[in-house]
């Protein structure tokens, strides 16, 4: 389940204070703190990402979001991460699928992209399960993936959240 991140919650987490949501063990992790810092430094009140929460008890186990608005070419890059104890349970796949479903309805978004470090097999498999295609080979430290919305994307239909 995705819950919008607010600047208030981001500031609280960065200050080591209660963000108003229950946190799971291992959250926030280092990458989450980096993303929250970027949100506070550069984002407006509605520019945050999303907290990934457990449906059973609402604990925050991770986060996901975009690295800014779509470019003129309709491409928007996403990022995501979970606290270590919650990886490998399908939570990340559900969260990224929900994020992509949200992006389907956003003006100007035609392609969703993601960068994955070479060797991060769980993240590679997650993107493949959701219909992303590899854009480039293993040169460098990251591999780049893309999903064209509305072009046979697995369950993602251009123009609505059906």
Predicted feature descriptions by range:
Residues 111-116:
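Conserved hydrophobic beta-strand within the GNAT/NAT acetyltransferase core sheet
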Residues 1-77, 82-85, 101-102, 106, ...:
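GNAT-family acyltransferases
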Residues 86, 90-99:
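Conserved acetyl-CoA pyrophosphate-binding loop and the N-cap/start of the following alpha-helix
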Residues 93, 118-136:
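Conserved active-site alpha-helix within GNAT-family acetyltransferase domains
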Residues 90, 107-108, 131:
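Short glycine-rich hinge loops at helix-strand junctions in the catalytic core
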Residues 73, 90, 122:
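Residues that form or flank phosphate/diphosphate-binding pockets in enzymes
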């Amino acid at each position: 389940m995705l819950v919008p991140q607010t600047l208030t919650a981001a500031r609280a987490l960065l200050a080591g204070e209660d963000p108003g949501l229950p946190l799971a063990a291992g959250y926030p992790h280092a990458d989450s703190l980096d993303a929250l810092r970027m949100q506070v430094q550069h984002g407006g009140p509605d520019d945050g990402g999303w907290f990934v929460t457990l449906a059973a008890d609402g604990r925050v186990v991770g986060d996901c979001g975009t690295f800014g608005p779509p470019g003129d070419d309709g491409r928007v890059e996403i990022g995501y991460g979970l606290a270590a104890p919650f990886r490998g349970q399908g939570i990340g796949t559900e969260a990224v699928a929900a994020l992509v479903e949200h992006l389907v309805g956003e003006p100007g978004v035609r392609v969703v992209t993601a960068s994955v470090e070479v060797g991060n097999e769980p993240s590679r498999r997650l993107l493949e399960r959701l219909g992303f295609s590899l854009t480039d080979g293993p040169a460098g430290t990251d591999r780049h993936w893309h999903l064209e919305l509305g072009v046979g994307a697995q369950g993602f239909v251009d123009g609505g959240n059906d």
